Amino acid sequence: MKKSILTAFYGGTFDPIHNGHIKSAIALAKLIHLNRIILIPNGSPVHKPIPVASAEDRINMINLAISEISEDIFEIDYREINNKIPSYTINTFENLRKEYGPKAPLGFILGQDSFMKLHTWYRGYDILKFCHLLICARSNNMINLKKIKFKFIDPKILHYIPFGLIYYAFTPIIKISSRNIRLRYKFGISCNGLISSSVQKYINKKNIYKR
């Protein structure tokens, strides 16, 4: 069986991108030996409220955040944020599979909380027909592995098989949320340590979350 390097995609509203996004992604990259994580910011998310920050501001904040870290593994895919209609994850991965071909290993990074709601997504579990699911821990409450027919696998296998596996990554628990950061800005509470310094300056300069 021939090994190919797994390409991982990390979708989200990133409103704003914060240290939890970055640190959990880097931790996952080290666990499963990723050298490429492609961020896919949502345009009009189906399962979340309309973003507060504009598409342009969210893209600028992502670029600022990833420019501050030493790991050169992050890229941005603009397909969803440039889409004028709501984007479904299944459609994105159908297109990615066509672009990368049938044999390329692809992975979708999502938090434990999002994974537990996957059954509510449009064709949520069909995503496994196109990529692996890479689950990052979000709390100390462990997923009921038997209930979801979860199997622990050697992460090396993710680089040999193109799709269909679920991997639970014991990444550090980082209790940060974009919603909490927006509320902090609204009420004038410091966000030091939660987002990068350049993103903080950008938010303050444009007064994004105090409107």
Curated annotation (Swiss-Prot):
CDD domains: NMNAT. PANTHER family: NICOTINATE-NUCLEOTIDE ADENYLYLTRANSFERASE-RELATED (PTHR39321), PHOSPHOPANTETHEINE ADENYLYLTRANSFERASE (PTHR39321:SF3). SUPFAM superfamilies: Nucleotidylyl transferase. GO terms for biological process: NAD biosynthetic process. Belongs to the NadD family. It holds the Pfam family CTP_transf_like. Its EC number is 2.7.7.18. It comes from Wigglesworthia glossinidia brevipalpis. This is Probable nicotinate-nucleotide adenylyltransferase. GO terms for molecular function: ATP binding; nicotinate-nucleotide adenylyltransferase activity. It comes from the Bacteria. Catalyzes the reversible adenylation of nicotinate mononucleotide (NaMN) to nicotinic acid adenine dinucleotide (NaAD). Pathway: Cofactor biosynthesis; NAD(+) biosynthesis; deamido-NAD(+) from nicotinate D-ribonucleotide: step 1/1. It catalyses: nicotinate beta-D-ribonucleotide + ATP + H(+) = deamido-NAD(+) + diphosphate. InterPro entries: Cyt_trans-like, NadD/NMNAT, Rossmann-like_a/b/a_fold. Keywords: ATP-binding, NAD, Nucleotide-binding, Nucleotidyltransferase, Pyridine nucleotide biosynthesis, Transferase. The keyword Transcription regulation does not apply.
